[in-house]
Amino acid sequence: MTIAKIRCRLFIMKDKIIDAAIRRVPDFPKKGILFYDITGILVNPEVFSYCLDKMTEMYKDKKVDAVAAIEARGFIFAAPFAYKMGIPLILIRKKGKLPGETYSASYDLEYGQASVEVHKTDVVKGQKVLLLDDLIATGGTLNAARSILEEGGAKVVGFCGVVGLPFLNYSKVLGDLPVKTLIEYDSEKI
């Protein structure tokens, strides 16, 4: 086994605090999908705080001007993260939820299709933006969010998630930008 594979296996070893809070729900939202439910983190203030502290530690020395969050669960982690980092929060919403002029993009999900949009006024040209979501699966949502931010002139500098599912190959979709997660799972098996 190579050093890279050993490091990968060690990284995929679960953070026990976070792992204990994540519930696995088989066949949701459709048959054959194992859903990693992060609500156990939210009902436990100590685990939620632990996650925010880990995220802040990962990015405290990085050049990030703003964080953009994916609706809806990404908002939950991004708002306190933005506050702790002292940076603005940009909301990436589902299509049809924003009243002003928007940038919009469609994408494929692990289990369907959707569109996201952002207010044009919220995107600042040249701003270095970190994209944050609760879970990174195929990377489709984050890639669509990146495209609308870049359309407005922002520079996406990385992706962050609470949970990562690298076996769904999100790195191929997200390209060469850094992807950081607090915990990763290597399959959809219980």
From Swiss-Prot:
Gene3D superfamilies: 3.40.50.2020. Transmembrane segments: none annotated. It is found in: Cytoplasm. The keyword Glycoprotein does not apply. It comes from the Bacteria. It is an enzyme of class 2 (transferase). Its main location: cytoplasm. The keyword Glycosyltransferase applies. GO terms for cellular component: cytoplasm. PROSITE patterns: PUR_PYR_PR_TRANSFER. Pathway: Purine metabolism; AMP biosynthesis via salvage pathway; AMP from adenine: step 1/1. InterPro entries: Ade_phspho_trans (IPR005764), Adenine_PRTase (IPR050120), PRibTrfase_dom (IPR000836), PRTase-like (IPR029057). It catalyses: AMP + diphosphate = 5-phospho-alpha-D-ribose 1-diphosphate + adenine. GO terms for biological process: adenine salvage; AMP salvage; purine ribonucleoside salvage. Keywords: Cytoplasm, Glycosyltransferase, Purine salvage, Transferase. Pfam families: Pribosyltran. Its EC number is 2.4.2.7. GO terms for molecular function: adenine phosphoribosyltransferase activity. HAMAP family: Aden_phosphoribosyltr. Homodimer. Catalyzes a salvage reaction resulting in the formation of AMP, that is energically less costly than de novo synthesis. Belongs to the purine/pyrimidine phosphoribosyltransferase family. This is Adenine phosphoribosyltransferase. It comes from Treponema denticola (strain ATCC 35405 / DSM 14222 / CIP 103919 / JCM 8153 / KCTC 15104). The lineage of its organism: Bacteria, Pseudomonadati, Spirochaetota, Spirochaetia, Spirochaetales. The gene is apt.
